[in-house]
Amino acid sequence: MAKRTPSIDTKNLTAVQLMELDACVRCGECVKWCPTYAASGGKPGLAPRDKILRWRQYMNKSYGLKAKLFGPQEVSPSELEEFKDDVHGCTTCGVCATVCEAGINTVEIWEAIRTNLVKKGIGPYGKQSAFPKLVGQYHNPYMKDQKDRLAWVPPDVKIEDKADIVYFTGCTAGYNQLALAFATSRVLNKLGIKFAMLGEEEWCCGSALIRTGQVHVDDVARELARHNVEALQKKGAKKVLFACAGCFRAAKIDWPRLLGKELPFEVIHITQFLADLIQADKIKWEKPINKTITYHDPCHLGRHVGVFNAPRYVLSHIPGVKFVEMDRSKEFQRCCGAGGGVKAGMPDLAVAMGESRVKDALETNADILSSACPFCKRNLSDGRDALKSDIVVEDIIELVAEALGLSTS
């Protein structure tokens, strides 16, 4: 009698990741910190520890001693479907990795498992499955015309055809959250920074595909990275600026992995760029912002890349600003809820997480909740609205523009 085929396989999981899965000691520290678990009201399947233990159980059924002696035990399709839902209910924020006593790199594991399941036809979740087709066809996830990439640019903004510095706008700022694009471009002009943009040659960074386990689908993610790098080189880029934390993370970490080589230019977040200018005394403020401001660390900018100080340095140097920290900040911040495809796949869960983060901000009595990512701004605003709060949600670059006397509309 032929042995049953294993229900799962180990593809996309490295030897190190397999050892990390085995290293979990079930202490539960990650459960205390997980924002999706908390926002769900304590749904056991969303707890990081539970996901690791379940996958380990599936591995034992497929490849353990009993499986080798008597053949693999089946993991039912319904069980794998439920697991798929739970593993996609994670924003990949990385706080579980931060607090893990065993040092498990959970973000890499979640993305590897998602990819593994998608390759087997299990997942992704809901609307997430449309990402490869949309981005592959339109080169952005919003089905917008690429010719409109620079349609937002106002007459007062000067853009070079080629320059050492290129501003990578991102799909969300370029199409949906224009205030961030207005603010970034006008701030650069005000500071005398000559910069270029890619226009219709700017394609999606690919973050949504990678985060949702679809990095391999039709090789779209790799093609996006290749095209963007080549387009940036043609513009003469030596330094590429990002005001979107998701795009920044994709360029900084994912593009080199996809292409198998280092990038031929420096990638830097706008807060790092501004912090350097402030330190060099090259910014002359024109208008004080007499408000109390707190700051939310985008997961992709903070825990994923390690940029914590630059945003705070910028905020603390804006005249009139009283800066206050939330209890959970920097490495231990609470995710806004927008990442990992959750905003698209599970919007109600995303907003519930946004509400939790806004409550953290309200405890500081801040007038303004700031961040440095359009996705964070969107979901924090949704959380604020759900709470019927009057706290203002603004991106750091908008605040910088205001303090320089510039319009963001």
From Swiss-Prot:
Q: What molecular functions are annotated in GO for this chain?
A: 4 iron, 4 sulfur cluster binding; CoB--CoM heterodisulfide reductase activity; metal ion binding
Matches recorded under InterPro entries: 4Fe4S_Fe-S-bd, 4Fe4S_Fe_S_CS, Cys_rich_dom, HdrB/HdrD_reductase, Helical_ferredxn
> Is the keyword Ribonucleoprotein in the record?
no
Q: What is its EC number?
A: 1.8.98.1
Keyword field contains Iron = yes
Instruction: Write out the GO biological process terms.
Output: methanogenesis
Q: Which residues bind [4Fe-4S] cluster 1?
A: 24, 27, 30, 100
* UniProt pathway: Cofactor metabolism; coenzyme M-coenzyme B heterodisulfide reduction; coenzyme B and coenzyme M from coenzyme M-coenzyme B heterodisulfide: step 1/1
Q: What does the record's cofactor remark say about binding?
A: Binds 2 [4Fe-4S] clusters per subunit.
Residue stretches spanning the membrane: none
Enzyme class label: oxidoreductase
Tell me the ranges covered by the 4Fe-4S ferredoxin-type domain, including all copies: 14-44, 81-110
Q: Which cofactor does it need?
A: [4Fe-4S] cluster
- Binding sites annotated in the UniProt record for [4Fe-4S] cluster 2: 34, 90, 93, 96
One short Pfam name that applies is Fer4_8
Similarity comment: Belongs to the HdrD family.
Subunit details: The dihydromethanophenazine:CoB--CoM heterodisulfide reductase is composed of two subunits; HdrD and HdrE.
The task this protein performs is described as: Part of a complex that catalyzes the reversible reduction of CoM-S-S-CoB to the thiol-coenzymes H-S-CoM (coenzyme M) and H-S-CoB (coenzyme B).
Protein's name according to its UniProt entry: Dihydromethanophenazine:CoB--CoM heterodisulfide reductase subunit D
Q: Which organism is it from?
A: Methanosarcina barkeri (strain Fusaro / DSM 804)
